[in-house]
A protein has these predicted regions:
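Sequence/structural signature of beta-propeller domains
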Residues: 1-313
């Protein structure tokens, strides 16, 4: 059993024109790079970021800064917002290129509903600050996946060599299994960049089974790639039978997969926090313990999301 440490709540800046929502309540993705934390929330139209020093993780409480990604305003009403939200669930760092020497961030919607089939690329400045963003329509890509995965729900992803790896999150419904999906990374990025001649095709689909708690399967909500090519997955057991309806979080855990996708370690998290994002706290890994950062989604707009820290053996 692992015991996460609370580092901070994810408050937004307060201004004279502040909206009623003063915090993130549905954090869904996390990247740590360029001395910053970058976050997305599944019911927001913005990227959020804040300076972060892994040497003093518990001493930082500056408000999050926002960078708009999608146009328009989402409804304040909880039910209407859930129907309209873009459901941005995957946040990953793309490698540097001559056109983007600091790399780019890529956000992906979960893909189930039409409103959730968009991606946003964000350029990063020399200091890591978010710059211009480009919105991509992923309808064709997700239509192809939906043909073979009925309850499509992409929750995380990463680049591993020449592969793009995406995580399909399962649920309690019969046949709704979690899976690791792989694609040709170069082809996907070319397609994303405008070469729409040929859709990226699914190369492999590996079923993921992490057991269950009280009859509820542990399913992946995010992933962080490690320097050795293995990855850490955040897992929750949410008592629901579809990808849209929320349910009670029965348990939470972290799992480590080797580069071949085989399970190496699985540890439950005390308190069953509904973790939706995971990232390495530092790239300078010493020994066998991984310092990880986690963000939570309480499925309640009145409850702020939190940033947690845990040592993963």
């Amino acid at each position: 059993m692992l015991y996460p440490e609370l580092l901070r709540t994810l408050y937004l800046p307060t201004t004279p024109k502040s909206a009623p929502r003063r915090w993130l309540s549905a954090a869904s993705g996390l990247v740590h790079s360029h001395g910053r934390l970058y976050l997305i929330a599944d019911d927001e139209h913005s990227l959020y970021h804040v300076a972060f020093d892994p040497a003093q993780p518990a001493l930082q409480d500056a408000p999050l800064l926002s960078c708009p990604l999608l146009p328009g305003e989402l409804p304040a009403d909880r039910r209407a917002r859930k129907q309209a939200k873009p459901d941005l669930e995957t946040l990953m760092l793309l490698p540097a290129t001559p056109a983007a020497p600091q790399g780019r961030l890529l956000c992906l919607g979960s893909g189930g509903r039409l409103a959730r089939r968009r991606a946003v690329e964000i350029a990063l400045g020399t200091d890591g600050s978010p710059g211009e963003s480009v919105i991509h329509d992923l309808s064709g890509f997700f239509d192809t996946l939906h043909a073979s995965i009925s309850d499509l729900n992409i929750e995380g992803g990463f680049l591993l060599g020449d592969r793009l790896c995406l995580l399909q999150r399962g649920n309690k419904a019969p046949g709704a299994h979690s899976a690791l999906l792989t694609f040709d990374a170069k082809r996907f990025l070319r397609w994303l960049g405008g070469d729409r001649c040929e859709l990226p095709q699914l190369q492999s689909r590996q079923s993921l089974d992490f057991g269950n708690v009280e009859g509820v399967p542990l399913c992946p909500t995010d992933a962080a790639l490690l320097p050795d090519g293995s990855c850490v997955l955040s897992l929750v057991a949410e008592d629901t039978s579809d990808s849209v309806a929320d349910g009670r979080c029965v348990a939470a855990a972290l799992a480590r997969l080797n580069p071949q996708g085989e399970l190496v370690t699985l540890e439950r998290l005390h308190g069953a926090p509904k973790i939706e994002g995971v990232a390495l706290a530092t790239t300078a890994i010493a020994g066998t313990v991984l310092p990880l950062l986690l963000v939570t989604d309480a499925d309640d707009p009145d409850q702020p999301s939190t940033l947690l820290h845990v040592e993963f053996p």
